[in-house]
């Protein structure tokens, strides 16, 4: 059976890991399908980009918009939870964009399976420390983005994936 997880990167990885565990424990196909559908509905993915340059190169935005956004230091804030890329806002500095991610996490209530995803973000460990009041540091996974997502997101992209309760 094919199930659309509406997820990517570590969000998808969490679903696969839990489904594999259920299969290993002897879960039936129906039980595993129900588990995957439940996890998919509870998976959240948010990210912030550090530059608009890669969006311009990939044809996702025009040159004028990229130039203006770069001049104003816009950092796009994205919600990928629905399986589509949705602009959830924009911030003017890196610090504000990371604070936006923290506010998203704080607004969710109880969360689990938190992963930080990044593309060579030098401040990833600092960000992990900042959110350790929300999820203990030893429960936070940090993962480098793959080539495809990293190509679109560009250097210093940083995001979070997690499950809501």
Task: Annotate each language-model stretch with its function.
Residues 1, 7-165:
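Mixed-charge interfacial surface used for oligomerization/domain docking
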């Amino acid at each position: 059976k094919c199930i659309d997880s509406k997820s990517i990167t570590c969000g998808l990885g969490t679903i696969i890991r839990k489904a594999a565990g259920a299969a290993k424990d002897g879960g039936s196909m129906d039980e595993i399908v129900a588990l995957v559908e439940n996890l998919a509905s509870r998976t959240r993915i948010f990210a912030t980009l550090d530059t608009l340059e890669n969006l311009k190169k990939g044809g996702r935005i025009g040159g004028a918009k990229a130039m203006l956004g770069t001049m104003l230091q816009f950092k796009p804030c994205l919600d990928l939870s629905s399986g589509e890329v949705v602009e959830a806002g924009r911030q003017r500095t890196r610090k504000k964009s990371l604070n936006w991610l923290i506010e998203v996490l704080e607004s969710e209530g109880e969360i689990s399976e938190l992963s930080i995803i990044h593309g060579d973000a030098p401040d990833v460990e600092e960000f992990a420390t900042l959110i350790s009041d929300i999820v203990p540091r030893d429960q936070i996974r940090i993962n480098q983005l793959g080539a495809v997502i990293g190509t679109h997101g560009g250097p210093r992209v940083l995001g979070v994936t997690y499950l809501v309760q």
